[in-house]
Structure formats: C-alpha cells, structure tokens
C-alpha cells in the first residue's frame, strides 16, 4: 500500500501507513515565496540563502517561475561581468573537487570572494543527480567568503547545466569576483564551458591514455592551461614525461588565442603546471 502524505498550509506532515515504505519517503520543505525585489536586495547584501533561492528560481522549469527569473536577471545584469570566470575540467578521478577546494582556499587568503558552480552528471533514465560535490569541498563550504552550488546537468551537453551562465551572473551580482565552474568531466562534449569562461583549465592525470588520442577528443583544442595533477612520489618523472609528450602532440593543433593581458613576455599557451 502506498503511504499517504498529508499537506497543510504551515507544516508538511505525513502519515506512513506501511512501514515498508519508510526508506522511500522524501519530505520536501515548503519554500517561502520571495519577491524579485527581495531576492535582489538579498543577493546584493551577500545573503547566501537568498542567492540559493534565486538560483533555484532560474533552474525551475515552471512557466510562472521562468517569467520571474527573466525579470530577476534583467534587474541584476548591470551588476555583472566583474569577475574572473574559470572553467575546470578533467576525466572522472582527475581530482577536480580536491583541486578546486585547495585553489579556492588559496584565493580566499588573497582577499577574493569565490563561488564554485559544480555540475554533476544526471541519470539518463531518471534525470536525478547525487549532487555530492559540496560534501567533497567541506572545508571550503564553511568559509564565509565562499559559495558552493552543485547543480545537475539534466542531460545538457557541454559540461555545464543549461542555467550555468545565468547562475554565474547571479554570483557576480552577489559580489563574487572569482567564479570556478567544475564541469561534469566526461569528454569532448565539455567544450561549451570555454565559451562562457575567461580561462579554461584541463586537469590531466598521469597514465590517462595516448596523448594524440586525447587530442582527437577535441577538448585539448579549447583549453588554456593544462595542469598535470597527482604528482607525488614515483610519479614525478612520469609527470615530466607526460608534459613532453603533450608538448609534442600539441604541435598538431592550431593556436588558440584569447585577449589576455600578459604579466610576462615569455611563455606559450597552453601552459603546463608540473614539476
């Protein structure tokens, strides 16, 4: 027998008529309604809770919510475009979450405000997502000047969610001057993130496969920085070899330039970070 759930105006109560269903029950709290003006005031005052509500609003697929979301985005647009946007990609297991947590904490020490938009893969059958990135960045999530928002990809290709750009604008309006976007991490479809970021960083792990094959996947053509990760112990020499192999392989690719202001007259992109 399916358990009965009773709703009231003030509280969400439930009655489980069959204890066998207890492990399958999910109780969703009722969300208080906020006006667009309240959301804007909260965003600009640095209220993380209201920033989260605003992001939930733009992620909603309901028609009435879409109309409010459009109004909200129009109002906050003059306060956007003032951040450094960094996209971070890599195959699953490359250490993206660990890298972002450490990089984010380093940025905080320099006085930056950091927002992390973590995109989690969604089930192709049920469209659900675990959204576990925030738990993997526990220390960063406790920082006052850091904001972490996991979002499901919902099957959207490009390594990001279909509202990632709008979410980024909301974070900029909230005063976050560095936006880190962690992509799903599945391969060549992730190149869309390069179009909405200033810097596109690729985390490479040692022994990740033939470098020419990696270039065929397409993503290597779009990156600005290649970061060779998990370099410790016996892997140091392997990392140097991987760097040389990548440098040789990248000669087959056309150059990709962005309008960066260089702090040094030397160096060529993509840049490598490895011992």
Where are these regions (language model features)?
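Nucleotide-state-sensitive switch-loop elements of NTP-binding domains
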Residues: 35-83, 94, 103-189, 196-211
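Well-ordered beta-strand positions
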Residues: 199, 224-225, 248, 271
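Short hydrophobic targeting helices and cationic amphipathic motifs
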Residues: 7-8, 12-15, 19-22, 28
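Conserved Switch II/interswitch segment of TRAFAC-class P-loop GTPases
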Residues: 197-213, 224, 231-240
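Hydrophobic positions on the alpha1 helix immediately C-terminal to the Walker A/P-loop
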Residues: 99
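Hydrophobic anchor at the beta1->P-loop junction of P-loop NTPases
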Residues: 86-88
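Canonical P-loop GTPase G-domain recognition
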Residues: 232-275
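P-loop (Walker A) phosphate-binding loop of NTP-binding proteins
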Residues: 91
């Amino acid at each position: 027998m399916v358990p009965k759930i009773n709703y009231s105006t003030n509280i969400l109560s439930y009655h489980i008529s069959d204890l066998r269903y207890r492990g399958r029950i999910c109780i969703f709290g009722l969300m208080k309604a906020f006006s667009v003006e309240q959301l804007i005031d909260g965003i600009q005052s640095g209220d993380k809770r209201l920033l989260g509500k605003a992001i939930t609003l733009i992620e909603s697929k309901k028609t009435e919510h879409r109309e409010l979301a459009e109004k909200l985005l129009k109002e906050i647009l003059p306060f956007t475009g003032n951040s450094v946007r960094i996209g971070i990609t890599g195959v699953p297991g490359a250490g993206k979450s660990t890298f972002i947590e450490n990089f984010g904490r380093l940025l905080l020490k320099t006085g930056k405000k950091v927002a992390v938009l973590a995109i989690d893969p969604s089930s192709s059958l049920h469209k659900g997502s675990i959204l576990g990135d925030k738990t993997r960045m526990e220390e960063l999530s406790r920082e006052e000047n850091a904001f972490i928002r996991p979002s499901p990809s919902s099957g959207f290709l490009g390594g990001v969610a279909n509202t990632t750009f709008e979410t980024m604008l909301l974070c900029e309006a909230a005063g976050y001057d560095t936006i880190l976007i962690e992509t799903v991490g599945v391969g060549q479809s992730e190149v869309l993130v390069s179009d909405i970021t200033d810097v596109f960083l690729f985390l490479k792990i040692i022994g990740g496969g033939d470098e020419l094959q990696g270039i065929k996947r397409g993503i290597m053509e779009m990156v600005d920085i290649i970061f060779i990760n998990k370099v410790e112990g016996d892997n140091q020499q392997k990392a140097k070899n991987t760097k040389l192999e990548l440098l040789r392989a990248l000669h087959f690719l056309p150059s990709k330039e962005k309008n960066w202001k260089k702090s040094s007259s030397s160096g060529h992109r993509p840049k490598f970070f490895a011992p």
